[in-house]
């Protein structure tokens, strides 16, 4: 994990790709975020989070370059249960993802250009949808792709069907 993270930033530096790595205070620890600023007149700000086993850095390859070329600022973020938060601080996922997003937005007040887009990949789609349902003022628009609507349904695809009734009855 640490090697992949270190090599990612070495790669950005070697390619002279500007970025700002920022620690955002949250509860009794901090969340890593990564800010990329477009060189164009900004059309808005994209807030992107990944899913269950996502690393903050892997989100660069799915969205950042294209978004910057299209004129958007990009803020990648992780929350409890992801990346460093789980590996270093042993912080599990929270059902209150709206509080995670609020902390990120608060920390980036000066950099945000509206409209604000919340983008969630995989389980991140569920997290962004949940945050937006709990606080409709977080984002102007929400984009969910490779959406992961239900952890249990996903789990069930990997176990024999004979065991499915036990999952429904919660043993």
Language-model-derived ranges and their functions:
Residues 78, 115-118, 141-143:
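Residue in the alpha/beta-hydrolase core beta-strand immediately N-terminal to the catalytic nucleophile
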Residues 134-171:
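Hydrolase active-site cap/lid region
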Residues 52-65:
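The serine-hydrolase catalytic nucleophile loop
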Residues 40-43, 48-55:
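Active-site glycine-rich loops that stabilize anionic/oxyanionic intermediates
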Residues 67-85:
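Conserved alpha/beta-hydrolase
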Residues 90-112, 116, 123, 127:
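Alpha/beta-hydrolase active-site loop
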Residues 2-44:
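N-terminal cap/lid segment of alpha/beta-hydrolase-fold proteins
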Residues 49, 77-79, 145:
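Alpha/beta-hydrolase
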